[in-house]
Amino acid sequence: MGALDVGIELGVFLDIPPKVDAPMGLGMVFVTTNDYGAQLNVNFYQNTACRNLEAVIQTTMEAKFKQAPTSAAGTLRLFFHDCMVNGCDASVLLASTPGNQAERDAPINLSLAGDAFDAVTQAKTALEKICPGVVSCADILAIATRDLLSMVGGPTYPVLKGRRDSRVSRASDATRQLPTANFTVNQLNALFGSKGFSQHEMVTLSGCHTIGFVHCGEFLNRIYNFSPKSQTDPTMNPGFAQQLRLSCPDVNLDPNVVVFLDQTTPKIFDNTYYKNTVKGEGILTTDQELFTDLQTRPQVEQYALSNSLFVNDYISVITKMGNLGVLTGTQGEIRRALDCASVN
């Protein structure tokens, strides 16, 4: 049993995302006119040599999942971080160049999992052997996310296709458009609202944390010296806080250590994330805020009682997110780099 296997059993493991250094050109910013993918189509590749792309991607993801089960959570997070920043255009996959710091190198993205980037690379490599220059990196990421999610018990759903890849990626955009671990419900509502999501949809998307993981540094302020009167955030279950302190000591903490956001069923996509917040076991401030804030508590309680309600809502919201701000038609390009890290 390796270090990763041991860590998974303990609910804590190491994740060190690799860096990819590849050139990226600068192009004009393309703005799509369709808000939620009106030009996308489930059968977009039907009349191309890539008509079997879903089978190819699924086979590739099965191999990736067998090699690294945490790829499911990592790829889902990568997809979210791509779509929330100027739309689902694979801009998060582009590498920085001497003249430009790309999204993936923004501080908030430095913890994106290396296995997630590799999942896209593996699928792109397989497809380029069959039909070079046809399938976009953005479509691959959307389909790979769905497939990996299904391997941890998540729902399967049709993925609309026809996204094109952006030629632009800026770290400053990621910093402005992604939520941090300490966001309040009002801040979350404002950010998600700017992307066209309702509060209800924001709470549903937060359920992605049922298979997520996070570095200790993102929540140390909740379990150590929270205030002059309390070591622990009073909204956190004291016993749970002590459990987290064992995984994340405040002395000589390894910055690469991460813990599962759902400590109960970390390998299963289900509604346990919401059950945990009801018990005061939300790890991030943003997690626990969903129950603490009376605006969102009723929905959290509903999801905690019904896995089917959460899953059905999730299918609708993840589909909407996947169609957010997409490039279509002649916008952007179909990236040819196997790692999707550089423009053509």
Regions found by a protein language model. Give the residues of each.
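Catalytic cores of secreted/periplasmic or lumenal enzymes
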Residues: 25-344
